[in-house]
Amino acid sequence: MAQRIFTLIFLLWTAVGTPQVAASSFGQKLFGNSTTSRFLPVDGAFAFEFQQQGNQLNLRWDIHPDYYLYRAQIKIEGNGATLGKVELPQGESHNDEFFGQVFILRDRLALAVPIEQAESGATVKVTYQGCADAGFCYPPETRTVPLSQVLATANTDSPINTLSGQTAPPQTTPMPFSPWWALLIGIGVAFTPCVLPMYPLIASLVLGRKEQLTPRRTLLLSMTYVQGMALTYTLLGLIVAAAGLRFQAALQHPYILIGLSVMFIALALSMFGLYTLQLPSSVQTRLTEWSNRQQGGSVTGVFCMGALAGLICSPCTTAPLSAILLYIAQSGNMLAGGGTLYLYALGMGLPLILVTLFGNKLLPRSGPWMQYVKEAFGFIILALPVFLLERILGEAWGIRLWSALGIAFFGWALMLTLSSKKGWMRGVQLLLLAGVVISAKPLQDWVFPPTGTAQTHTSALNFAPVANIADLNSALAKSPQPVMLDLYADWCVACKEFEKYTFSDPAVQNHLSRITLLQADVTANREEQNALLKKLQVLGLPTIVFFDTQGKEIPGSRVTGFMNAEQFQAHLQKFSP
């Protein structure tokens, strides 16, 4: 009797439970297992760790094989903290059909973030994004890292490794150019029309005496004059860098960077002759009188003359000097600030040393070429706002700005050579023309994108937009047909491949004509979009979700990763009416 009761219970359970299980199993077999399992969750693909060691924050990603991070999408921002410069590895070049040449990072990524100052409760926001080689891309991932308090002291440039007890090398903010470039800039400024003709006069004032001096004495006096001038410039560099270090956090603000860029552009325009920048004439006259009172020929007098000469800025030196000072202030690097200005002054003084030793015969003849040197420095100064604006506008716009600057410089140089009759100049003109063409390539690709490059999101299908969970629920409730929800983002390469190769296929479009089409664009990564992705349990893109007429997701029908037109059509035939 008991055995019969047990058999009856078993048959009832089978009758009730088996259809559901069977239906689910049938759906799995019919549509194939959900392809979500093909891809790892974001924490499995990019395992992220962090550790603060004194005033250094160490970030680490363990990147799973066949996955990669986009170098340009790694962003680190401090909240209540001032962070130093973070150097990212170059990565490997990756040619993408839709985004062009990009750099990606594989295997492992370790970054050391200098913390110059951190308030109590400060945090660091770390954003990163990556994809799988199979074409599956993850939304931008943001992690908030808490920081321990770090006081802004003179020792904050030397992070202490609390694990080993060893002091790491000082962390400084690197400048875009080596300070040694300042030496070449100083030499170049010496050959501008406001400076070069003055060297014979300055040489006579430095030597002072009419009797013949020994070469050693002449070299000593000229070097003393240059060192006096260099001292003034070095002190200016140290003062400005110290001020910049104190207000470095404010100087990183976008509005400040834009203001500095405008000032650099104004300084560059003065080098092109649009207007003149110099000290007020009354101040220059007084400084000149003080300089003339010094006794030429004596070491002390010549040193004072050089120190005062460093304050007398001619129209040709004001703009380059101001540009260097502004950039030093923005970098906040005292060592580089003082050294850069010293080398700049030394470069300006080298022609003077040669004139005092060998006379005027070593100086080139004056001519229009000196004005060309001055204008060339205008282009050099224009490079500085590009460096600053690139931080705000991003890498893509930075390349376009460099492109525009390259076109302007090579075009200007080409125009200067057109009047030359010399045969060898034709080769120079060809090189300059090639420079114009190469520089124009990024702008050309932006204005006239190559075939296959999508500048705006356009679809071959007529999707109804869905912005959030409420929109999706409303659309599902109203639709008398099955529903296909396409989750799209501009940063998703495979999403663009779906648009170009799959949704444009006539057979696919014919099947989809009997289905309500919805699309959620999650490019902006807003909170409501993230909530939608979380509700649908979407790991990454592309993801396409199918719902039945009751608004329920059809088991096993979800698509993750790219499918070509033939594969997608076969998938649709399994459940489309």
UniProtKB/Swiss-Prot annotation:
Cleavable signal peptide: 1-23
Pfam families: DsbD_N (PF11412), DsbD_TM (PF02683), Thioredoxin_2 (PF13098)
UniProt key word Transmembrane: yes
Membrane-spanning segments: 182-202, 225-245, 255-275, 308-328, 338-358, 369-389, 396-416
Subcellular location: Cell inner membrane
One GO-annotated biological process of the protein: cell redox homeostasis
Chief place where the protein resides: membrane
Disulfide bridges in this chain: C131-C137, C194-C316, C492-C495
EC number: 1.8.1.8
Keyword Transmembrane among UniProt keywords: yes
Gene3D superfamilies: Glutaredoxin (3.40.30.10), Thiol:disulfide interchange protein DsbD, N-terminal domain (2.60.40.1250)
Catalytic reaction list: [protein]-dithiol + NAD(+) = [protein]-disulfide + NADH + H(+); [protein]-dithiol + NADP(+) = [protein]-disulfide + NADPH + H(+)
PANTHER family per record: THIOL:DISULFIDE INTERCHANGE PROTEIN DSBD (PTHR32234:SF0)
Protein name from the UniProt record: Thiol:disulfide interchange protein DsbD
Species: Pectobacterium atrosepticum (strain SCRI 1043 / ATCC BAA-672)
